[in-house]
Every structure is written in structure tokens, then in C-alpha cells.
């Protein structure tokens, strides 16, 4: 594991900058509602929960899936659910691992096309770099579906199935204001990988949700982000990033991790430093182990990004397309859901694989 880079960033909210920020939020953002535990937010660009009705023989269809990596539990489980749903319709399933490398993911897509897949599902490592590979697949006659992320609109894809990452971030930000009150926030971020659009959506949603809630409830915004580490979406990456953060900023009182795995790794570093009582930890994805930590009072909150639901929805869209349906939303979002100690029992399943 490469040594984690820690980028110090000071976010100082001055009055004039706050006004500009808030105007920008109103214009470009999704307006947030007051959050309560378990509140859901949806985007207007479509959500499709209806089961696909299959009227054709799919047993000769080979569906290919290219994941950006298998280094995080989320990616592993998402691949498993896509496989389960595809095989449930009788389709053959093949997959390829991009191994956290853009060139490798591009060649993996090419390999899947060469292997004769009829349909391709891609979770892009980079939303711009994957465009030529996706368009080449479509040109060869293979329709492409995007899952768990988005791709540049110049790509010729059928639909993108993704979590409402900005909405999840907003819910996390609102919860922090309600939880920490007028405590002066000194926060650190642990992000996944540089340039990843999903991580960016989460942290911008967090800043927006925090700003709107604190402005509404306290009349001002006071948030300082003193450090950003990179954990590559892994438990060990979160541990290493947090160790570096604590050396430079031992007095932080909030950690926002862009997935639960990194947050749990960071918790280990926080415990080893003897600072668990003074730092609130929040994450994203809704991993089973994070739910357990919430129940134990060691994790503040997480936001739901269900690999099970993503796997179901993307295969649903594939089946509808193969059955001739063309009125498929260009983007399909799963709802944003906040999980805290108040509603964790509703979502926690000790037998869940994620």
C-alpha cells in the first residue's frame, strides 16, 4: 500500500463567501429538506423499482460486467449481485477486474467484447477515460449500461444506475449539525481515490447539507476542514490515512469517510491514539459492520448505497432493453437514506453479505 497522501485544506467560511456559496447551492444544488433519522431523498431523473417482465429466451445471452476494482467489499458484493440477478434470468455471466488501473479497465472491456458478450455493464473508474471504450463497444453492437457511477454524456450508453450520492451527503451533513449543535467543527475527510466522481458527489453533498442546515438553524456557517486523506476505498487505506491525519491534526472532532470501509479502518487508528471519545465518525454505503458499530455507539451515522439494489436495478434495465423497451430513464437513482442509532435495526441484517 502506497503511503497515503494528506492534503491540508482550510475551509474558512467568511460572510461574503458564505453568501456566494449559498446562492450557488440554490442554483446548482438539490434543495435539502430537514432531516430526521431514516429520511429518504430521491432525484427527479427517474427511479425504477418495477420488476422486469421477460418474454424472450435469455439463455443464450452473455452479459459482461467490468468492475473498477475488487479491493473493497462493496465492489465484490456488487459483482455478486449482478451475477445473481443475471443468472436468475438465465443469462450467462462473465466479469473482468479493472484492478484500479484505467488502462487495465479499458483493456478488460475490450477483452469482454472479444469474448462475445451481448450486453456490457461497466462501473467506470474514470468518467472521461472510459468513453472511447464504451463507444467502441456500442459501435460493435454491444449495448452498454453504467452502474454505481456515471460517465461523461458523450458516451453512448443506455442508462446509468447509481446511488443518490449527493442526497446521501446532504443527509450526513444535516445530521452532523443536529448532532454536534454549536460545537466548533474541525473536520477531516478520508476520500476514496483522486478524481473519482462518486466521492466528489458525496463530499460536496455533505458540505451543502451541513451549510444549509447550520445556516437555517444557527444563522451562520462555521465549518473548518483541516485535512483530506486518500484511503483507496479500503479498510487498510483508511487506517493509514487516519494515522497521518492525526499526526498533523490531533485535535479534530469530526471524520467524514467516503465509505464505511475506510471509516472502520480510521476508527482503528483513532482507538489506538486514544481519541475515540472526542471524534464523531460518519461514513457511506451502509455496510453491515458499520451498522454494528452504530449499534455499539462507535460510529455516528452512515448513508445507504445498496449493492443489492444496484445489482437488481441494472439487470432489470438490461432485461427490459432486451425485451424491446426503449423508454428507459437515462439516470436511475436509488433513494438517499440516513442510518443512525434511531433506525439502524430496520436495516441491519446479521446474515447480510454486505
Which residues fall in each region the model found?
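A residue-level marker of the well-folded mature domains of exported/periplasmic proteins
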Residues: 2-3, 10-13, 17, 32-354
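Bacterial N-terminal signal peptides
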Residues: 20-29
Amino acid at each position: 500500500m502506497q503511503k497515503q497522501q494528506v492534503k491540508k485544506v482550510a475551509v474558512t467560511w467568511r460572510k461574503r463567501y458564505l453568501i456566494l456559496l449559498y446562492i450557488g447551492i440554490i442554483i446548482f444544488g438539490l434543495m435539502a429538506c430537514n432531516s430526521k433519522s431514516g429520511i429518504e431523498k430521491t432525484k427527479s431523473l427517474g427511479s425504477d423499482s418495477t420488476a422486469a417482465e421477460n418474454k424472450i429466451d435469455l439463455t443464450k445471452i452473455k452479459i459482461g460486467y467490468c468492475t473498477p476494482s475488487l479491493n473493497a467489499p462493496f465492489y465484490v458484493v456488487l459483482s455478486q449481485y449482478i451475477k445473481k440477478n443475471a443468472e436468475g434470468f438465465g443469462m450467462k455471466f462473465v466479469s473482468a477486474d479493472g484492478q484500479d488501473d484505467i488502462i487495465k479497465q479499458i483493456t478488460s472491456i475490450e477483452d469482454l467484447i472479444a469474448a462475445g458478450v451481448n450486453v456490457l455493464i461497466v462501473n467506470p473508474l474514470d468518467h472521461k477515460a472510459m468513453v472511447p471504450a464504451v463507444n467502441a463497444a456500442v459501435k460493435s453492437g454491444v449495448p452498454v449500461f453504467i452502474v454505481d457511477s456515471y460517465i461523461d454524456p458523450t458516451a453512448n450508453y443506455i442508462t446509468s444506475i447509481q446511488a443518490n450520492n449527493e442526497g446521501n451527503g446532504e443527509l450526513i451533513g444535516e445530521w452532523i449539525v443536529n448532532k454536534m449543535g454549536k460545537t466548533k467543527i474541525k473536520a477531516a475527510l478520508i476520500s476514496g481515490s483522486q478524481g473519482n466522481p462518486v466521492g466528489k458527489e458525496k463530499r460536496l453533498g455533505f458540505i451543502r447539507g451541513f451549510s444549509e442546515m447550520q445556516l437555517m438553524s444557527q444563522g451562520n456557517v462555521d465549518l473548518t476542514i483541516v485535512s483530506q486523506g486518500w484511503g483507496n476505498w479500503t479498510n487498510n487505506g483508511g487506517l493509514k490515512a487516519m494515522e497521518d491525519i492525526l499526526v498533523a491534526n490531533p485535535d479534530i472532532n469530526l471524520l467524514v469517510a467516503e465509505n464505511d470501509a475506510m471509516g472502520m479502518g480510521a476508527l482503528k487508528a483513532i482507538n489506538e491514539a486514544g481519541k475515540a471519545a472526542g471524534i464523531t465518525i460518519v461514513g457511506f454505503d451502509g455496510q453491515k459492520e458499520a451498522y454494528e458499530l452504530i449499534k455499539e455507539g462507535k460510529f455516528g451515522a452512515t448513508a445507504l448505497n445498496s449493492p443489492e439494489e444496484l445489482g437488481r436495478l441494472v439487470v432489470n434495465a438490461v432485461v427490459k432493453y432486451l425485451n424491446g423497451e426503449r423508454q428507459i430513464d437515462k439516470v436511475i437513482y436509488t433513494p438517499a437514506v440516513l442510518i443512525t442509532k434511531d433506525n439502524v435495526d430496520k436495516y441491519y441484517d446479521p446474515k447480510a453479505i454486505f
